[in-house]
UniProtKB/Swiss-Prot annotation:
Protein name: Cytochrome b
PROSITE patterns assigned to the protein according to its UniProt record, in alphabetical order: CYTB_CTER, CYTB_NTER
Biological processes per GO annotation: mitochondrial electron transport, ubiquinol to cytochrome c
Note on how the cofactor is bound: Binds 2 heme b groups non-covalently.
Note: Heme 1 (or BL or b562) is low-potential and absorbs at about 562 nm, and heme 2 (or BH or b566) is high-potential and absorbs at about 566 nm.
Transmembrane segments: 33-53, 77-98, 113-133, 178-198, 226-246, 288-308, 320-340, 347-367
The organism of origin for this protein: Myotis myotis
Keywords: Electron transport, Heme, Iron, Membrane, Metal-binding, Mitochondrion, Mitochondrion inner membrane, Respiratory chain, Transmembrane, Transmembrane helix, Transport, Ubiquinone
SUPFAM superfamilies per UniProt: a domain/subunit of cytochrome bc1 complex (Ubiquinol-cytochrome c reductase) (SSF81648), Transmembrane di-heme cytochromes (SSF81342)
Gene assigned in the entry: MT-CYB
Its membrane topology: Multi-pass membrane protein
Subunit relationships: The cytochrome bc1 complex contains 11 subunits: 3 respiratory subunits (MT-CYB, CYC1 and UQCRFS1), 2 core proteins (UQCRC1 and UQCRC2) and 6 low-molecular weight proteins (UQCRH/QCR6, UQCRB/QCR7, UQCRQ/QCR8, UQCR10/QCR9, UQCR11/QCR10 and a cleavage product of UQCRFS1). This cytochrome bc1 complex then forms a dimer.
Binding site for a ubiquinone: H201
InterPro entries reported for this sequence: Cyt_b/b6_C (IPR005798), Cyt_b/b6_C_sf (IPR036150), Cyt_b/b6_N (IPR005797), Cytb/b6-like_sf (IPR027387), Cytochrome_b (IPR030689), Cytochrome_b_C_euk/bac (IPR048260), Cytochrome_b_N_euk/bac (IPR048259), Di-haem_cyt_TM (IPR016174)
Length: 379
């Protein structure tokens, strides 16, 4: 009699995806983040679902409903802070996951990579809309500033912004639709994750050497299930430390003030995970230029497979490319810091230099250094 795991149609999919999946024997902990992202998504959907049971998406009651969740709902404060800090963990894992892909050349699986970039956009959109829902000062003004950027689009911009707002300013209609989309998008993301995995399982995983590992594969379970559980324990530990000891560390104090259209906060800034993009947006003293730079800062990931000039896939054996990669990481940290600073000297020029360096590394320096490395190795 055949094992039900291998014969039952639904079980077969799970068996082939998480149990008998052939995986390279040498993938490091950098390959943990895929499963961690899946767990983050599940956690966000669950906590979000329970929060939505008590939240009201009306400008008059939104702020108070969030306060009510924290004060009156059983363990409502745990739900809220798990959801808010879970988003931070989600983005930490996302950026590490993308960084791993860049370092080890995983982007050569173009279908998987492109679906991943679309997923990144979808998660960023979801997080932005979620930040608007508590209807604090930073929620309101963040929504106003970011949606207003669309008015830079020639000809249709102004009408587009009013259409998104559902009126002449960010108001009740805006909040209601943001809640609707914030609820809907994670389920679309879940479906896209399945497409992401479908494309990945067509090729199998990459590995740190960037050399095909078809001759040395091991089953996913028990080796990588156990390895992933270690990563999960570490992530849950960090998340619980955040939630239980300093739940507001990554938030903005301004968001504890109810939204007031008549009073602008002195420094409007997004959550920490958008600060690098915000710095790139602000570094260009032109509205349309800034918006284009903002979109391109993420969209540039799509063309990375086209910019790969090296004969080697991974950066593991390319010290010059490694130096550039870590320079890029340092540059992103710099821009994250700049995004949270006021628009004044010397922050303006630092932000502009960081933005120029960001695009230069990806478009010019990386391909050129890879090309030079080929010649150094006489390839």
């Amino acid at each position: 009699m055949t094992n039900i795991r291998k014969s039952h149609p639904x079980m077969k999919i799970i068996x082939x995806s998480f149990i008998d999946l052939p995986a390279p024997s040498n993938i490091s902990s950098w390959w943990n983040f895929g499963s961690l992202l899946g767990i983050c998504l599940a956690l966000q959907i669950l906590t979000g679902l329970f929060l939505a049971m008590h939240y009201t998406s009306d400008t008059a009651t939104a702020f108070n409903s969030v306060t009510h969740i924290c004060r009156d709902v059983n363990y409502g404060w745990v739900l809220r802070y798990l959801h808010a800090n879970g988003a931070s963990m989600f983005f930490i894992c996302l950026y590490l996951h993308v960084g791993r892909g860049l370092y080890y050349g995983s982007y050569m699986y173009t279908e998987t990579w492109n679906v991943g970039v679309i997923l990144l956009f979808a998660v960023m959109a979801t997080a932005f809309m979620g930040y608007v829902l508590p209807w604090g000062q930073m929620s309101f003004w963040g929504a106003t500033v970011i949606t207003n950027l669309l008015s830079a689009i020639p000809y249709i911009g102004t009408n587009l912004v009013k259409w998104i707002w559902g009126g002449f300013s960010v108001d009740k209609a805006t909040l209601t639709r943001f809640f609707a989309f914030h609820f809907l998008l994670p389920f679309i993301i879940s479906a896209m994750v399945m497409v992401h995995l479908l494309f990945l399982h067509e090729t199998g995983s990459n590995n740190p050497t960037g050399i095909p590992s078809n001759m040395d594969m091991i089953p996913f379970h028990p080796y990588y299930t156990i390895k992933d559980i270690l990563g999960l324990l570490l992530m849950i530990t960090v998340l619980l430390m955040l939630v239980l000891f300093s739940p507001d560390m990554l938030g903005d104090p301004d968001n504890y003030t109810p939204a007031n259209p008549l009073n602008t906060p002195p420094h409007i800034k997004p959550e920490w995970y958008f600060l690098f993009a915000y710095a790139i947006l602000r570094s260009i003293p032109n509205k349309l230029g800034g918006v284009l730079a903002l979109v391109l800062s993420i969209l540039i990931l799509i063309i990375i497979p086209l910019l790969h000039t090296s004969k080697q896939r991974s950066m593991a054996f390319r010290p010059l490319s490694q130096c550039l990669f870590w320079l890029l990481v340092a540059d992103l940290f710099t821009x994250t810091w700049i995004g949270g600073q006021p628009v004044e000297h010397p922050y303006i020029i630092i932000g502009q230099l960081a933005s120029i360096l960001y695009f230069s590394i990806i478009i010019i320096l990386m391909p050129x250094i890879s090309f030079a490395e080929n010649h150094l190795l006489k390839w």
